[in-house]
Regions:
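Subtilisin-like serine protease catalytic core
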Residues: 2-85, 94-99, 109-116, 130-135, ...
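Extracellular S/T/G-rich loop segment that most often corresponds to the catalytic His/Ser-adjacent loop
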Residues: 23, 157-229
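Amphipathic alpha-helical segments in well-structured domains
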Residues: 50, 117-121, 155, 191, ...
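Alpha-helical scaffolding within the catalytic cores
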Residues: 83-90, 153-157
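Active-site neighborhood of phospho(di)ester-bond hydrolases with catalytic His/Asp-centered motifs
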Residues: 101-103, 136-141, 171
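A short, flexible beta-alpha/helix-coil linker loop
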Residues: 106-110, 212-213
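Glycine-rich, charge-decorated loop segments at or immediately adjacent to ligand/cofactor-binding or catalytic sites
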Residues: 142-164
Length: 229
């Protein structure tokens, strides 16, 4: 990643790119790492989760250059959870949004909420067919401790709905040994397809906090913004 960001490498900073972030709160813009690069559309006060996810995508690392995000000069459109999906046509037209990060689920808890391709899955698949330059990235879920019969523990635990869609990228978490993290959801989904499509480090991810500092968090919520960024 460092070589991709470096001027002597690919120099991929995210400049000129707009990323949508669907999460549970606004991004508090006094956090220096986001100054002048956030379009807030969330009607809720900031929370740790939303700020941390956003920093992984596009934090500038101004307080500490070692802690910048994957696309430190990208513009962020912040919206409440799945409203980033339903609002995507508007944000594509108004802000040229090309990718979204989605660290949430709309599914029921437990095994009844795993693996189903439903009306929500179909909706997002159709939208991505209509907007060929738009990519949606979703956290797989943290249900790796479930046993959903007839599968053994941890399998068939991808969240239903958006995460099961065929055109999105669903992201799982790796542990420090580069094996699937115990908490990370994984397929197959109900129609037999394999998910997630990709995995990344999901333990103790360091990113922005709301009080002008950095902090760690773990989970697939912290992994999908690595891929989206």
């Amino acid at each position: 990643v460092t070589s991709l960001l470096s001027p002597s490498g690919k120099n991929l900073s995210g400049r000129g790119i707009t990323v949508g972030i669907g999460d549970n709160s606004e991004i508090i813009t006094p956090q220096l790492d986001f100054t002048a690069r956030v379009i807030n559309r969330v009607p809720f006060p900031f929370s740790f989760h939303g700020v941390h996810v956003s920093g992984t995508v596009a934090g500038a690392g101004l307080l500490d250059p070692k802690h910048n995000g994957m696309a430190p000069r990208a513009t962020i459109v912040s919206q409440y959870q799945s409203e980033i999906i339903t609002s995507s046509p508007t944000y594509v037209a108004d802000h040229n949004m090309v990718v979204t990060n989605n660290s949430y689920t709309n599914a029921n808890a437990g095994c009844p909420g795993e693996g189903a391709y439903d009306v929500v899955s179909n909706y997002v698949d159709k939208q991505m067919g209509d907007y060929e330059k738009l990519l949606h990235v979703f956290a797989a879920g943290n249900d790796g401790a479930l046993t959903c019969s007839p599968f053994p523990i941890k399998y068939a635990t991808i969240k239903s709905g958006y995460q099961v869609a065929k055109n999105v990228i669903t992201v799982g978490a790796l542990d420090t040994l580069y094996a699937a993290a115990s908490f990370s959801s994984r397929g197959p989904v109900n129609d037999g397809r394999l998910k997630p499509e990709i995995m990344a480090s999901g333990l103790n991810t360091l990113s922005t906090r709301h009080n002008f500092t950095y902090g760690t968090s773990s989970g697939t919520s912290m992994v999908s913004p690595i891929v989206a960024g």
